[in-house]
Curated annotation (Swiss-Prot):
This is Large ribosomal subunit protein bL9. It comes from Wolbachia sp. subsp. Drosophila simulans (strain wRi). It comes from the Bacteria. Keywords: Ribonucleoprotein, Ribosomal protein, RNA-binding, rRNA-binding. Belongs to the bacterial ribosomal protein bL9 family. NCBIfam families: L9 (TIGR00158). Gene3D superfamilies: Ribosomal protein L9, C-terminal domain (3.10.430.100), Ribosomal protein L9, N-terminal domain (3.40.5.10). The gene is rplI.
């Protein structure tokens, strides 16, 4: 089925391009999300008329995504899951769980924009999850899956201390560079 993209989609193409996709993908995902329309002569002429407006809208979404990406930079999420003695969790971690935790922390992210990179999280440990905020903005966040609340609290304290020390080092480096610049 030929469709016209109404926004940039990393795996398909750019705004305004006519691409061929499977009918089910178009009907069940692209059309309901208003990411594409069927490629007809009418829609092609409408799109040409609306192209400028759509491009402005896309730029606004990109700017919002970049702002959200800054707030998610160096973000980590700690999940507490029941697990066996060998570290295998009962069930698996889902994108909905991660999105729910991020929402509790004030970040509104659709679970469909989270990607585990082709793996399923079924063991305790540290994992990278990509958050696709826009077709051009993908932010990695770290997921820690732990067994108990005690482990989670210890991990949070260690991570926060590391972030504070990194921030202090960056400030010291900036102050040192500023002082070196004043001497010349």
């Amino acid at each position: 089925m030929l469709i016209i993209l109404k926004e940039n989609i990393r795996t398909l193409g750019k705004l305004g391009e006519v691409v061929k996709v499977k009918p089910g993908y178009a009907r069940n995902f692209l059309f309901p999300q208003r990411k594409a329309v069927k490629a007809t002569k009418e829609n092609l002429t409408k799109l040409e008329e609306q192209r400028l407006l759509l491009e402005e809208e896309n730029i606004k979404r990109l700017n919002v995504a970049k702002e959200l990406a800054l707030s998610l930079h160096d973000k980590f999420v700690v999940l507490i899951k029941q697990a066996s003695e060998d570290g295998k969790i009962f069930g698996s971690v889902t994108t909905r769980e991660i999105a729910k935790i991020l929402l509790q922390e004030g970040h509104v992210i659709d679970h469909r924009s989270l990607s585990f990179g082709g793996i399923s999280i079924k063991n305790l440990g540290e994992y990278q999850v990509n958050v696709e905020l826009h077709s051009e903005v993908v932010v990695p966040i770290t997921i820690y899956v732990v067994k108990s609340e005690t482990d989670a609290n210890e991990l949070r304290q260690v991570k926060l201390q590391n972030q504070k020390s990194e921030q202090q080092e960056a400030e010291q480096d900036a102050n040192k560079e500023a002082a070196d610049g004043d001497d010349s």
